[in-house]
Amino acid sequence: MAEDDIKIVMFCCNWCSYGGADTAGTARMQYPTNIRVIRVMCSGRIEPQFVFKAFREGADGVLVTGCHHGDCHYDAGNYKLDRRMRLIYKLADELGIGRERIHHDWISASEGEKFAETVKMMVDRIRALGPSPIKKQLAEA
């Protein structure tokens, strides 16, 4: 799969991981441009249907990022995300998407380098996996 064909949707917490994206950009760190960032107020607000809609809309992978445990602006949003991610991974396997197409991580506003590394890791993983099975099904329909 050519790198230009890879599409990854990344949900970023407004208070931490979006700041990490900003830090990476401001510091001119190099990372693939295959991501489309969606800024959410809190990672705890990310519902399973958001992740699966990204796949229906043509994403090959989804990244979900939020504040480190203990740093949530809203107290426990990242703990809610932890619980939801267990469900999301299970559903991804049951739907034939595969949990390896989804990744969640904690990135603070000062971790621009971690942001860039996480994006690179995900692009490499998706390149190895090839197009999303949902994308293939939609192309055949």
UniProtKB/Swiss-Prot annotation:
InterPro entries: MvhD/FlpD. Keywords: 2Fe-2S, Electron transport, Iron, Iron-sulfur, Metal-binding, Oxidoreductase, Transport. Binds 1 [2Fe-2S] cluster. Its EC number is 1.12.99.-. Its cofactor is [2Fe-2S] cluster. GO terms for molecular function: 2 iron, 2 sulfur cluster binding; metal ion binding; oxidoreductase activity. The F420-non-reducing hydrogenase is composed of three subunits; MvhA, MvhD and MvhG. It forms a complex with the heterodisulfide reductase (hdr). Part of a complex that provides reducing equivalents for heterodisulfide reductase. MvhD may form the contact site to heterodisulfide reductase. Belongs to the MvhD/VhuD family. This is F420-non-reducing hydrogenase iron-sulfur subunit D. It comes from Methanothermobacter marburgensis (strain ATCC BAA-927 / DSM 2133 / JCM 14651 / NBRC 100331 / OCM 82 / Marburg) (Methanobacterium thermoautotrophicum).
